[in-house]
Each structure stands twice: as C-alpha cells, then as structure tokens.
Curated annotation (Swiss-Prot):
GO cellular component, one term: extracellular exosome
Region (Coil 1A): 98-132
UniProt region (Linker 1), positions on chain: 133-143
Species per Swiss-Prot/TrEMBL record: Homo sapiens
Name under which the protein is recorded: Keratin, type I cuticular Ha5
Annotated gene: KRT35
Length: 455
C-alpha cells in the first residue's frame, strides 16, 4: 500500500535589488511534496499555512508557506531548484539526506548573502538620498534679498524720477497756461485800445460835425450880418429918399408933426437885431454845449460800462484760466497716479507669479521627496518582510536539520515497531513574518512505507 506524506510547498519569484546595484536576479523555487499519510489506526492529518506576498518595485517575492509539517518516511523527499528561469528536479532517495542538507545549506547561504547585499544597497541608497537632499537644500531656498533690495532701490529712484517728471510737466503746463493768460490779457488790452481808438475816432467825427455846424452857424451869422448891412443900407437909402421927399413937405407944411428920428429907430432896430443875433448865437452855443455834454456823458457812461464789462470779462477769463490750470494739474496728477497704480499692480502681480511659481516648484519637490520617502519606506518594509521570511526559512531548515540528526526514518517492518511511536518530534513554533500568525507543530504522523520499497 502506497504511502504519501503531507504536502508543503515553497516558491519565490524574482527578487531584484531596488537600487539597481546588482544587475542579476535570482529565482528560487522549492517544493517538498507528500500528499497525505494513511495509517492503520490514525486519521490523516493535513496542515496548511497562509501565503504571503510582497511586491518590491518591479520585483516580487512570493512564499506560499512558511513552516510546513513534513513527514520523512523511508524514502519520500523531493526538491526542485530553479536559477535564472530554468527548472531542474533532484530526487533524494533513501540515504541522501546529507546531500539534501548540503543543498539546503547552500540555499541558506545564498539567501543570507542576498539579504546582506540588499541591506548594503539600502544603506547606500539612503546615503545617496541624504546627500541629494543636502545638495538640493541651497537650490530650494535661494537668497534673493540683495536682488530685491536693488530692485526696490531702482523702483524708488524710478518713482522719484516719475514724480519729478510729473512735477515738471505740471510746471510746464502752468507756464503754458500763464503764457496763455498773458496772451489773453494782451489781446484784451489790444481790443480795449482799439475800442478807445474807435471811440476817439467817433468823437473826432462828432467834433468835425460840430465844427461844421459851427462854421455853418458862423456863415449864417456872416450872412445875417451882411443882410443886416444890406438892410441898413436899404434903410438909409429909404430914409434918405424919405428925407428928400419929406424935406419938401416940411418946407411946405410947417405946422406938421415932428419927424421921426430915424437914427434912433435904426439904433433900436440894430439893437433888436443884435439882441436877436446874440440870443440866437447864445442859444446855438448852449445847444452845442448841451449836445456836447450829453455826448460826453454818454461816452463816459458807455466807457464806464465798457470798462466794467471788460473788467468782469477779464476776471471771468482769469477764473476760467485758473480753473483750467487746476483741471490740467488734476488730470496730470490723475494720469501719474494711474500710471503708478498700473506699474505697482504689474510689479506685484509679477512678484506674486514668481512666488507662486517658487511655491509650486517647492511643492513639487516636496511631493517628489515624499514620494521617494514613501517608496523607500515601502522598500524598507519589504526588505524587513523578506528578512523575516528568510529568518523563518532559516528556522525551518534548522528544525529540519535538528530533527534529521536526532531521528532516523521509521521502518514498520522492524521487530520493535510500534504504531504509537512517531517518526519525528514536534518542530519548534515559527512565524512567517512580522504580521503573520504563529503556527505550532503537532506530533508528526507515523509514515507507512510503500510496498516493494516505493514511496
């Protein structure tokens, strides 16, 4: 009757160093197979162990079981070892336990060497990361204070120059407005002079008219005088003719009334005419004086009104010019303030963009550093897990070696065979890793050899 032992499997994938220092990879798989033990008086016992898998970068390490319960009959132990992708099997027959132990020791030495190499690579990688971080610190925080001070000084000088330019522009505008004011005053005075000259010309025309009137009146007076002389001559002639006529009558008529005194009458007439002429002359002079005074009063009143209106116009023009000057100054100040505000906004926006860019770069660097730290932490945890698993395997192999050295394979055909005796003692408790549950061994089942010496 064929006898089969409990089955335990152990396999590991490719294990590659995270830092890339070692260019090769090792792939190991081992299998200890024995399916079950069938005894005449014992029920079959089967043990199973949890599987653990760990990923490291692009490499992987997978262990299906940490501590199998193994039966060692009088034959019945098989291993398989694969290196670099090739598979080969080695069957161990009865009496080849030393070779099996030697191969297991070689595998243990390889695992320990690999663990030591990975620890060295991890330490070198941590030192490289630390050196890189120390080298990157000055670059992450550059000192721009001197440049900022120079920029602030230049900005202050620029602002002072702009303020001085604005002040000079305002002064130039004020000078232009003052020149315009003086030009306006000059034009006003010229217009006043022209108005006075026109008034003088008008008065001269009036004076000429009055002179003409006076000459006309003088001509009339002369004509009246000539007429008076003519009348006097005519009167004398008439008087003489009348005298001649009356002389004869007087001679004839002695008792007649006394004759009229013609000289007296002529004197009276002369006095009357002279009085009339004098009155006319006086009236004409009075009328001329009255008209002249009225015209002078009108001219004076018009001149006063004109002067008051011109003064008011000048005052209004001065007020308008002052308001225009103030308006230009306010416009210039507003333009200067707007330009200063725009420059300040542009400067602060550029500084804000630079700071935002620096913050973004620092955040990106921090994110990269955190990602690297997390990756290194994961790799470190993976290495710790691998180390724990390797220690678990070492303990397993040590238990196997001790059990093989202390016990011999069971033979039921021997005279002193007893079914109650066990082939192997209980293995010590071992753990798969830091987080795996501990599995205690139970007494090993008794192996039954296969008929005909087969297992």
């Amino acid at each position: 009757m064929a006898s089969k032992c409990l089955k335990a499997g152990f396999s590991s994938g490719s294990l590659k160093s995270p830092g890339g220092a070692s260019g090769g990879s090792t792939r190991v798989s081992a299998m200890y197979s024995s399916s079950s033990c069938k005894l005449p008086s014992l029920s079959p016992v089967a043990r199973s162990f949890s599987a653990c898998s760990v990923g490291l970068g692009r490499s992987s390490y997978r262990a299906t079981s940490c501590l199998p319960a193994l039966c060692l009959p009088a034959g019945g132990f098989a291993t398989s070892y694969s290196g670099g992708g090739g598979w080969f099997g080695e069957g161990i027959l009865t009496g080849n336990e030393k070779e099996t132990m030697q191969s297991l020791n070689d595998r243990l030495a390889g695992y320990l060497e690999k663990v030591r190499q990975l620890e060295q690579e991890n330490a070198s990688l941590e030192s490289r990361i630390r050196e890189w971080c120390e080298q990157q610190v000055p670059y992450m925080c550059p000192d721009y204070q001197s440049y900022f001070r120079t920029i602030e000084e230049l900005q202050k000088k620029t602002l002072c120059s702009k303020a001085e330019n604005a002040r000079l522009v305002v002064e130039i505008d004020n000078a232009k407005l003052a020149a315009d004011d003086f030009r306006t005053k000059y034009e006003t005075e010229v217009s006043l002079r022209q108005l006075v000259e026109s008034d003088i010309n008008g008065l001269r025309r009036i004076l000429d008219d009055l002179t003409l009137c006076k000459s006309d009146l003088e001509a009339q007076v002369e004509s009246l005088k000539e007429e008076l002389l003519c009348l006097k001559k005519n009167h004398e002639e008439e008087v003489n003719s009348l005298r001649c006529q009356l002389g004869d009558r007087l001679n004839v008529e002695v008792d007649a009334a006394p004759p009229v005194d013609l000289n007296r009458v002529l004197e009276e007439m002369r006095c009357q005419y002279e009085t009339l002429v004098e009155n006319n002359r006086r009236d004409a002079e009075d009328w001329l004086d009255t008209q002249s005074e009225e015209l002078n009063q009108q001219v004076v009143s018009s001149s006063e009104q004109l002067q008051s209106c011109q003064a008011e116009i000048i005052e209004l023009r001065r007020t308008v010019n002052a308001l225009e000057i103030e308006l230009q100054a306010q416009h210039s100040m507003r333009d200067a303030l707007e330009s200063t505000l725009a420059e300040t906004e542009a400067r602060y926006s550029s500084q804000l963009a630079q700071m935002q860019c620096m913050i973004t770069n620092v955040e990106a660097q921090l994110a990269e550093i955190r990602a690297d730290l997390e990756r290194q932490n994961q790799e470190y945890q993976v290495l710790l897990d691998v180390r724990a698993r390797l220690e678990c395997e070492i303990n397993t192999y040590r238990g196997l070696l001790e059990s093989e050295d202390s016990k011999l394979p069971c033979n039921p055909c021997a005279p002193d065979y007893s079914p109650s005796k066990s082939c192997l003692p209980c293995l010590p408790a071992a753990s798969c890793g830091p987080s795996a549950a501990r599995t205690n061994c139970s007494p090993r089942p008794i192996c039954v050899p296969c008929p005909g010496g087969r297992f």
